[in-house]
Regions:
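N-terminal presequence-like segments and the immediate start of the first folded domain
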Residues: 1-13, 17-153, 157, 161-229
Length: 229
């Protein structure tokens, strides 16, 4: 299958926000390599939905979902969120670490905020790893509760009918969220994060894991799946 058939990607990066002795950040190094790899591919439906998340060890591990529909009956489109600048359009101001000497500048994270897949009047949407970012700036100094709430609000607008329609997806109503995976940076914030998510989505299955996220100031990241109808 071609690389462009990837619709969802999970990137597990050891010590994601750490920098090596030369000042190169692990996540930025990954983004530079991903950009070089993706440059040889035509992404006609947008980049994959993706999550970039930290691990304590293991180098880099990547998992993907891919789709190849030869008869054209299934449609795929990337979904932007007007509340957030597309990650692949970030400015240099929010890209950390030293620039790779082989590149003219640091490259951006190549993923879409979500990826919709549908056939006729039904389908699903992959929600990329989402955090408390508005525009391209993190919401800092507000604590885990507010960051969690802002993250959920970002997801809710992302999968809203108005936003899906704006992106060219013929949704009749908001996508129905069916599952979350919640990444929490600090153990002491775990129960507070669970409380905010559960109060808003008491019946939604959610997996919580303790791990680092892609910016040092961000305390939580949430990804999910939704049903289109």
């Amino acid at each position: 299958m071609p690389v462009s058939s990837i619709i969802r990607q999970w990137n597990y990066i050891e010590k994601i926000t750490a920098c090596d002795a030369t000042g190169h950040q692990h996540y930025q190094d990954f983004n530079d390599v991903r950009s070089l790899f993706y440059n040889g591919v035509e992404w006609t439906t947008g980049y994959p939905a993706a999550t970039g998340i930290g691990t304590q060890w293991g180098g880099i591990m990547i998992d993907v979902d891919a789709l190849l529909c030869k008869d054209g009956s299934v449609r795929v489109l990337g979904v932007d969120n007007p509340l957030q600048i597309a990650a692949h359009a970030y400015s240099q101001n929010v890209l950390l670490g030293e620039k790779d000497a082989a590149l003219p500048q640091k490259t951006t994270p190549k993923f879409e905020r979500a990826k919709a897949v549908w056939k006729e009047d039904h389908g699903f949407v992959y929600v990329s790893g989402t955090a408390a970012i508005r525009g391209e700036q993190s919401l800092e100094g507000v604590g885990i509760e507010q960051q969690t709430l802002t993250t959920l609000e970002n997801i809710e607008y992302l999968v809203s009918r108005d936003n899906l329609n704006r992106s060219g997806i013929p949704a009749m109503e908001n996508a129905t969220l069916i599952t979350f995976r919640v990444y929490v940076k600090r153990w002491e914030d775990m129960e507070k994060a669970k409380q905010v998510v559960t109060e808003r989505y008491p019946d939604l299955p959610a997996i919580y894991t303790l791990t680092d996220v892609c910016r040092s100031e961000l305390l939580i990241e949430i990804e999910g799946m939704g049903i289109l109808c």
